Swiss-Prot record:
Subunit comment: Forms the envelope pentamer complex (PC) composed of gH, gL, UL128, UL130, and UL131A. The pentamer interacts with host NRP2.
Membrane listed as a keyword: yes
Gene Ontology CC annotations of this record: membrane; viral envelope; virion membrane
Keyword tags: Host-virus interaction, Membrane, Viral attachment to host cell, Viral attachment to host entry receptor, Viral envelope protein, Virion, Virus entry into host cell
Identification of the protein by name: Envelope protein UL128
GO biological process: entry receptor-mediated virion attachment to host cell; symbiont entry into host cell
Primary localization class, coarse: virion
Species annotation: Human cytomegalovirus (strain Merlin)
Length: 171
């Protein structure tokens, strides 16, 4: 049978199906009130709803942003990146395995990649505290410290105690 001959048959079969039993994926419902005036403050969680509406959970309650503000959704969510916990980020997309998430322009999220812009990453550290270690400096510091200790012991004429503490077998 050609695809043209199957079309009426498949259409009739589709109409005969009981659509009440077909599982449907429903978008999460958002809160009823839409915020239009002030930016969110101290919000700690967000969810994407139907028609690109974003709902933020804040201490004052849930604040929603309407579909007309889709250009701002990315900016709205990124304002709260410092207050998102690692667990909240993980619960958004568990397949990312605690790695940062990337926020698309329309509010969708995906697992972050190495070359993504850092300003749109959720769950990434803004800066990693570090300390440069100069190995030569560490050796010199250790030698200087030992020499200072030896000099202080020599003043007190307790060189034998110093040798024992430092583990040297001086003869």
């Amino acid at each position: 049978m050609s695809p043209k001959n199957l079309t009426p048959f498949l259409t009739a079969l589709w109409l005969l199906l009981d659509h009440s039993r077909v599982p449907r994926v429903r978008a999460e419902e958002c809160c009823e009130f839409i915020n239009v005036n002030h930016p969110p403050e101290r919000c700690y969680d967000f969810k994407m709803c139907n028609r690109f509406t974003v709902a933020l959970r804040c201490p004052d309650g849930e604040v929603c942003y309407s579909p007309e503000k889709t250009a701002e959704i990315r900016g709205i969510v990124t304002t709260m990146t410092h207050s998102l916990t690692r667990q909240v980020v993980h619960n958004k997309l568990t397949s990312c395995n605690y790695n940062p998430l990337y926020l698309e322009a329309d509010g969708r999220i995906r697992c972050g990649k190495v070359n993504d812009k850092a300003q749109y990453l959720l769950g990434a550290a803004g800066s990693v505290p570090y300390r440069w270690i100069n190995l030569e400096y560490d050796k010199i510091t250790r030698i200087v410290g030992l020499n200072q200790y030896l000099e202080s012991v020599k003043k007190h004429k307790r060189l034998d105690v110093c040798r024992a503490k430092m583990g040297y077998m001086l003869q």
